[in-house]
Every structure is written in structure tokens, then in C-alpha cells.
Amino acid sequence: MIQKVGLVALALVLGAGGGQAQTFEGSVALSYGNAPFLSTDDDEERLSERGYKASGYLGATFGDWRVFGDINVYNRSIGDQDFDQYAPGGASSFGLHAGRNFGNFYGGAFVGRNRFQGTDATTINDYVSGSLYGIEAEYSMGAISVFAQLGRAKMIGDTGDTEFTGKFSKVGIAATVDRFVISAEFEQGNSPLNFEDSGDEGDYRALGIAIDYQITDRVIGTLSYETMDIIANTEDSGSDEFFGIGIRIPLGATGAKRNNLTTSYRPGLAAAWAETLD
């Protein structure tokens, strides 16, 4: 059903724009660093492993209409450790976005999927997938942009036991200062009926801060920090962090434009953490 909605949205955009793309945009990015974590199931000891993040998006505009796809990968090296006893090895997302520009305002919708570790997989550290969809908007005021997403996700890691099924939302701001782009975003999600155990509620809250520096028209240096708190109940909780330094390569006519409306992988990561905390 979700895939059908996405295809319909894409068809509407192409039809409304006459099928002739006016501009193309995109970027690819890679950052490398540390991915610390803490779990109440591990005596609340803060541990750290190496990690990386990779992302990319590609889109086009058709008149006032816009369509783009994106992929985002977060990876933590956990070696031969079992994720349900140690920490998740990360999560990834890919999505399709479509909407319309109304002057400085963009409004649209998105559909996508997450890949994350779950015990329903064939082997203990293998991945399962789940779906998500929602609406999104962005408003630009010169050098400042504000953006938001509201969605729903269904991420089942262990059928009948651990999952994240519920709503999530994200708000953020990005400001351009000379060659710098400074951005911050906050995301939260709630799984009201099932999380760590069947019938138990669970939440996550995440904060991300990034600084981009435009070295040349086609090379951007990046610094980023993200932290995510996962709360199963008063006894079980965890935190997941990432410090990274990297590079982003803009593509297309829009050059250094930043894509703020990414498809979140955090509902899937929360479902993986639910299994770790169980």
C-alpha cells in the first residue's frame, strides 16, 4: 500500500510538470567517527565503537513540483558481538518524497523503509525491514530555513515481542553564515502498545547538530554530533551517540543546497534497541 501511494505521488508530480525536469539536485556524503552507547542492561557503562554515516539524495523539479529520493546509512562496528546483548550495529533508511513549492514554502509527503537488526531475521545480527510514511514541510527565510516532518512507522523486530509501531515527528532549523551552514534538529517517537515487550510503551528522543563548511563549490566539509535516548520503562533505557567528521559532494544545478527533509532511520533503530534492552 505504501509503495503504491509513493508511485501515485510520483506520477502526479510528473504529470503536473509536463514530464520535463527543469532542474536536478542532489548530494552524496560520508562521515567517520565514534559511536558511543550506554545501556541499563550493561550496568550503565558507557562504551564506544567506531562508526560511520553515509547518505545521498537525488531529485528534480517540474515547475512548482518537486520529487526526490534519499538513502541514509548509520553503522556501528560491533564485531562478533550479538546486537541483542551488546548494542545495535546501526540502521538505514530510504525514501521517496514528493510535493509542491509555494514561493518560499514547500509542502509534501514521503514514504519509505528502514532496515534494522531484529531477531525475526535469519541470523542474530541480520536485518529486517519496516515501513514509514508521513507529511513534511520547509519554509525558507533568506539564510534561515525551518523544517518539520510528521509520520508513522511500523518496525517489528521480534513478532509479538519487540517493535516500534507509532508516530514520530521531527523539527529543525538551518542557517547559512558566509561559507558555513549550521543546522539542528530534534526528533521524537512513541510506540504506545508494544516496544520492549508486548503491551508496553516505549519512546525515543534524538538531537542532532551539524556544521557544514563549503571548501569549494563541489566540496563541503562536515562536523556532526547526534544523540538518541531510548526509554522502554523506568528500569530499561539506552543512549546512542555519534561524533563524525566527513565530506559532502553536491550534485546538480543547485550546488551546495542542503537537503533537510531526510527519511529517518530512527524508528528502526529504536526497534533494534528495544530488543537489546529486552
Regions found by a protein language model. Name each.
Residues 24-25, 62-69, 102-109, 143-148, ...:
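Repeated loop/turn-to-beta-strand initiation elements of outer-membrane beta-barrel proteins
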Residues 46-54, 75-77, 88-94, 101, ...:
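Residues that define the transmembrane beta-barrel architecture of outer-membrane proteins
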Residues 1-21:
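Gram-negative bacterial Sec-dependent N-terminal signal peptides
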Residues 28-34, 69-75, 109-113, 139, ...:
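Transmembrane beta-barrel strands of outer-membrane/channel proteins
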Residues 194, 214, 218-220, 228, ...:
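Flexible, glycine-rich linker and terminal segments associated
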Residues 20-81, 273-278:
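Short glycine/proline- and aromatic-enriched beta-strand/turn motifs that initiate or cap beta-hairpins
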Residues 58-62, 98-102, 139-141, 173-177, ...:
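Residue-level signature of outer-membrane beta-barrel architecture
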Residues 32-44, 48, 75-83, 104, ...:
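Gram-negative outer-membrane beta-barrel proteins
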